[in-house]
Amino acid sequence: MKIWIDADACPRVIKEMVFRASERLQVPVCLVANKDLSKAHSRLITSILVADGFDIADDYIAEHAAPEDLVITADIPLAARIVANGGVALDPRGELYTEENVGERLSIRDLMQELRSAGLVQGGPAQFGLTDRKRFASALDRTLTRMVKRKR
């Protein structure tokens, strides 16, 4: 079992929560990004620097994550790929992607992208806040507890 983080756009506070959970449960973490990341001081945490380009980090994660791994990503197409391969994906705002909800999330994402392109909608998601952090911490704890129990 490993935790993968789509690290380019992942908030620092989320990475720090994952690092603490990693130490507590002794689960390795791999950060994947197309820019250099500050190194966390733990033998359990590694970083992969991929080439700069559209979906390169996502492709790396999708190709290397195993079904027993957890992927932290806000990228809905990546989450859909992980779920389709039997894996577990969690959004930095605490939403667990499932077979039941990932298709709907993709459809909403695509619609919003079209509406933004047409100038009918402006802006993106709300600013990341305290409620999001709490929701993520709770979802991370529940998900990792379930995954660790299943592993044993």
Swiss-Prot record:
Q: Which residues form a coiled coil?
A: none
| InterPro entries per UniProt | UPF0178
Which Pfam family, any one of them, does this sequence belong to?
Answer: DUF188
The family line of this record is:
Belongs to the UPF0178 family.
This protein is called: UPF0178 protein Gura_4014
